[in-house]
A protein has these predicted regions:
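Domain-scale signature associated with acetyltransferase and cell-envelope carbohydrate enzymes
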Residues: 1-157, 162-166, 174, 190, ...
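Short linear motifs in intrinsically disordered
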Residues: 62, 183-184
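Active-site-flanking alpha-helical
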Residues: 163, 181-182
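Short beta-to-alpha loop/turn elements within the nucleotide-binding domains of ABC transporters
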Residues: 170, 182, 188
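Binuclear metal-ion centers of metallo-dependent hydrolases, dominated by the metallo-beta-lactamase
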Residues: 178
Length: 232
């Protein structure tokens, strides 16, 4: 695990395992996650269903935060990459392939991002549901097998509202806004505002998130002089 100064104090035990100090959950953080400088992992409870065996199963970028007991559920091949200055507020990620999130994104309570779904060849008769559940009960981790995971890409500066669901194979373009309880099953273009179930585009926003606009916004919302933070 690559380590820098985090936004939470952490301790290492004699076995080299990393714990968040004063975490209410007793478990350690997984060894194959990469926490960027000033990131906020919140609690080890978020990783109780994290089974990735990838060298880096999760990367949490500079100053990004996991809040409100978000959960990261991964299969052995799952890989989650989160950029800089991202807010994950009480969401759930389900990843058996890859989920990639760009810088400056916000996710509200109850969002679900899943790159895994049952494909059309799964038949849901009562008998097959019963057999599937009984077979799953024999698994040591009670893991249902998904047959066709597809990568998800969420580009920079996307805002996802309360309770939205993002389904496998979706790309959400830069600067888009996804409304509360929206179900996204198809790609969303940059700067689009999408709402509904299924998602429909109701308008497009002005592409005004350039570096110059960001600096002006920081000056407006942070009038007190602040020292420059190097996030490279």
């Amino acid at each position: 695990m690559n380590m820098y100064k985090l936004a939470q104090p952490v301790i290492t035990d004699e076995q080299g395992r990393l714990f968040i100090e004063n975490d209410w959950h007793p478990g350690p953080l997984p060894r194959n996650i990469e926490l960027g400088e000033m990131s906020y992992p919140d609690t080890a409870y978020s990783f109780t269903t994290f089974f990735s065996k990838r060298p880096v199963g999760l990367k949490l970028g500079y100053a990004s935060g996991n809040y409100g007991h978000s959960s990261f559920t991964t299969g052995v091949y799952g890989q989650i990459t989160v950029g800089k200055f991202v807010v994950l507020q009480g969401i759930r990620m389900i990843c058996n392939h890859s989920i990639t999130i760009g810088d400056h994104c916000m996710f509200s309570w109850g969002c679900v991002i899943t790159d895994s779904w049952f494909t059309d060849d799964k038949v849901f008769s009562r008998e097959q549901r019963r057999a599937m559940l009984e077979e799953t009960a024999k698994s040591y981790n009670r893991h249902l097998e998904f047959t066709d995971p597809k990568p998800i890409i969420i580009e920079e500066n996307v805002w996802v509202g309360f309770g939205a669901i993002i389904l496998p194979g979706v790309t959400i373009g830069r600067g888009a806004v996804i409304g509360c309880n929206t179900i996204v099953s198809e790609n969303i273009p940059p700067y689009a505002v999408a709402v509904g179930a299924p998602a429909r585009i109701i308008k497009y926003l002005e592409a005004n998130d350039s570096e110059e606009v960001k600096r002006a916004a920081l000056e407006e919302f942070a009038p007190i002089p602040t020292r420059k933070i190097n996030s490279d």
